[in-house]
């Protein structure tokens, strides 16, 4: 029996609130193309209310209720949220799959990661108190100095549709751990589980206004949030083009932003690999999450000596991937998120073919699936570096292949991109792997694997992939401001000015 999509409202000041204009957006199951529910369509007026609620929560009781509360207080709520996520894991995973098309096994894995992320930042919230008032050594003995780390304030969090609840958690958990209050705007293409997060927060008694959730279109809710004068920082994950707009809207107020944008990441495979292992990692690196990963290693840079064998094995493996309704047991590739994304990916493949590339396999709808936004896992060869398929992010299950002969050529091809989120190198030569980790210009490098991600390690990229790092111990610092406190600690007068004569 299909799980019903709960009919939620916006979540503002700890309560469900109908959108000001009373509008709602359809939720479409990408596996069936059928509407399965609705989400509220928030607009600027709703964003105003959410920001006001966040500001009130930040300042309530002079900050003692949240922003200046002991880290252990905030940690208690984060751990309670984590426990509820695990309690509702099956329900949430199913909702995620219905909403965005992710295979159910992957969605369940995501829910474990969501809970783990809240637990991790709960620990950092507690340890933050121990890091306060850290002394600074000074060259003058008559001064003492220490540092405080304080919440940056009200933060606007704008998140994508490929990992709806997990990507939201990457921002919500550290922001709340730091003592910030937040307004979350998830993607209109996949907001269902983020609204369920609101229900979880209500259930655990999170103080009103600490987390507010406004769903709606990017132009109607996301844009007003990123430009809002009451928001002290914006953190965004999404496309390069939208990231530019967010930077521009924040610039007049000199508002800090952190951006995790697109990628066109390389995976370099040398001729000394175990071919079967390397083929699986190569396909996993591009086809995991239906190919909709910002860090997808979608440019295969393959040594010429093994190119023929490797490509033959990739095609065989790709044809063996189960493409099905993502609720089916064993599904390993579901539909892409929307009709718009489906048409965009088909156009990428068509353009590559028209420019002279060869479609080794895939690029079309599976014959056994008449409905849904499905595309077979696709491998494209005979690619030139000037082609669109090499240069632009597809965000779908499409892998392009380029061959190389020397290590220097491989490095040049790997760095031949405006992006710099991630990269992978597969080789049995550890020294070679080390060289490439240093040479590839990216924020994340995987060695003999692709796509592992742990909340304990920082995540973020270079170049047009954005700036700032999420996760890891530094993840909480994204939402903290450093305050220097310096004290004159001598009984002697400063003595810079001559004291006036006493009458």
UniProtKB/Swiss-Prot annotation:
Pathway: Amine and polyamine biosynthesis; betaine biosynthesis via choline pathway; betaine from betaine aldehyde: step 1/1. It is found in: Peroxisome; Cytoplasm. Pfam families: Aldedh (PF00171). 4-aminobutanal binds at residues 260-261, 294, 459. Disruption phenotype: Reduced crop productivity, but increased accumulation of gamma-4-aminobutyraldehyde (GAB-ald) and higher 2-acetyl-1-pyrroline (2AP) biosynthesis, which influences aroma. Induction: Following submergence treatment, transient decreased levels that recovers after re-aeration. Its main location: other. NAD(+) binds at residues 238-243. Betaine aldehyde binds at residues 161-170, 260, 292-295, 453. One of its GO terms (molecular function) is betaine-aldehyde dehydrogenase (NAD+) activity. The keyword NAD applies. It catalyses: betaine aldehyde + NAD(+) + H2O = glycine betaine + NADH + 2 H(+). One of its GO terms (biological process) is glycine betaine biosynthetic process from choline. Belongs to the aldehyde dehydrogenase family. This is Betaine aldehyde dehydrogenase 2. It comes from Oryza sativa subsp. japonica.
